[in-house]
């Protein structure tokens, strides 16, 4: 039993609120089972006042999306001097901005796809890059707003310039990498293993593939050559360290296998607030490495600190 009081931050007001509610509820339940005193905090604009009144020993950050994983809540927790899980202010802000994260990764020698950043409103009838390419919001998660432009499309999709677009005006246009999708979790200074993600009935690992039951198949350990498996783990740890992450992160990759066992391996992005239900990718990897869900969360709580 632990006498620690843990405030689990969940919900919030980003487009990823439903995801956060799932993660936060699962984490709160598991932490209670581990013996912690848990308070669930559905985050609103008054979160600083709520936490000042609660004065928990640790905050478990189960928020996703802007405010929860872009350095904002991390800055509030630093100001309040409450130890918290996951990455700190700078690493969170860097990782949330796909463009900045890509620059840091490239400088660290991590292979990335060619890309450019532009205002989505400047899209005309001309392709900004030779198709196929991917358009993704610079500051969104859960694959919100991701559009794949195929080779046979004569002009960019109108949805990008539509008034109904709600993912910010800065978008990244990135060369599309064919092939298989892999992901690797990092816990502290250890890579947890590599999972292959196989979307079921979807062109890529979109929102439904991630969160709808049966939307994707997770293969762990990934069935891939040992040298590529090890390379993915090495690059995931390298990205975690280059961006300055703490606690847990997850890096996503595409591998275009040319059939020679080598192929092209590309790092796509890093997630400092990966999904945290028992069947989410990183907890699955932790279990594969020998850590049950509750034990994994206990490690995260005991790893919590300020000045992250």
UniProtKB/Swiss-Prot annotation:
Its main location: cytoplasm. It comes from the Bacteria. Belongs to the D-alanine--D-alanine ligase family. Pathway: Cell wall biogenesis; peptidoglycan biosynthesis. GO terms for molecular function: ATP binding; D-alanine-D-alanine ligase activity; metal ion binding. PROSITE patterns: ATP_GRASP, DALA_DALA_LIGASE_1, DALA_DALA_LIGASE_2. Mg(2+) 1 binds at residues 252, 269. It is found in: Cytoplasm. The lineage of its organism: Bacteria, Pseudomonadati, Pseudomonadota, Alphaproteobacteria, Hyphomicrobiales. Residues 102-302 form the ATP-grasp domain. Its cofactor is Mg(2+); Mn(2+). Mg(2+) 2 binds at residues 269, 271. GO terms for biological process: cell wall organization; peptidoglycan biosynthetic process; regulation of cell shape. This is D-alanine--D-alanine ligase. Its EC number is 6.3.2.4. It catalyses: 2 D-alanine + ATP = D-alanyl-D-alanine + ADP + phosphate + H(+). Cell wall formation. ATP binds at residues 128-183. NCBIfam families: D_ala_D_alaTIGR (TIGR01205), PRK01372.1 (NF002378). Transmembrane segments: none annotated. GO terms for cellular component: cytoplasm. The gene is ddl. Signal peptide: none annotated. It is an enzyme of class 6 (ligase).
């Amino acid at each position: 039993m632990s006498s620690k009081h843990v405030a689990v931050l969940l919900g919030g007001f980003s487009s990823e609120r439903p995801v956060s509610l799932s993660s936060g509820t699962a984490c709160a339940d598991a932490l209670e089972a581990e013996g912690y005193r848990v308070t669930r905090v559905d985050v609103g604009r008054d979160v600083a006042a709520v936490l000042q009144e609660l004065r928990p020993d640790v905050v478990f950050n189960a928020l996703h999306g802007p405010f929860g994983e872009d350095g904002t809540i991390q800055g509030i927790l630093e100001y309040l001097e409450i130890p918290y899980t996951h990455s700190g202010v700078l690493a969170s802000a860097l990782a949330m901005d796909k463009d900045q994260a890509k620059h840091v990764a490239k400088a660290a020698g991590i292979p990335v796809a060619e890309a450019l950043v532009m205002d989505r409103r400047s899209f005309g009838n001309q392709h900004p890059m030779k198709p196929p390419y991917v358009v993704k919001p610079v500051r969104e998660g859960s694959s919100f707003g991701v559009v794949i432009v195929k080779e046979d499309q004569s002009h960019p999709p109108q949805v990008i310039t539509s008034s109904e677009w709600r993912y910010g005006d800065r978008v990244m246009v990135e060369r599309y990498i064919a092939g298989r999708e892999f992901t690797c979790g990092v816990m502290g200074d250890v890579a947890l293993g590599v999972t292959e993600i196989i979307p079921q009935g979807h062109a890529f690992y979109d929102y439904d593939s991630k969160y709808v039951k049966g939307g994707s198949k997770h293969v762990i350990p990934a069935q891939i050559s040992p040298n590529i498996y090890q390379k993915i783990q090495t690059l995931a740890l390298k990205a975690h360290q280059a961006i300055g992450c703490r606690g847990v992160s997850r890096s996503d990759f595409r591998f275009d296998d040319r059939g020679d066992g080598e192929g092209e391996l590309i790092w796509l992005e890093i997630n400092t607030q990966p999904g945290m239900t028992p069947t989410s990718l990183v907890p699955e990897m932790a279990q594969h490495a020998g850590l049950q869900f509750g034990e994994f969360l206990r490690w995260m709580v005991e790893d919590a600190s300020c000045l992250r």
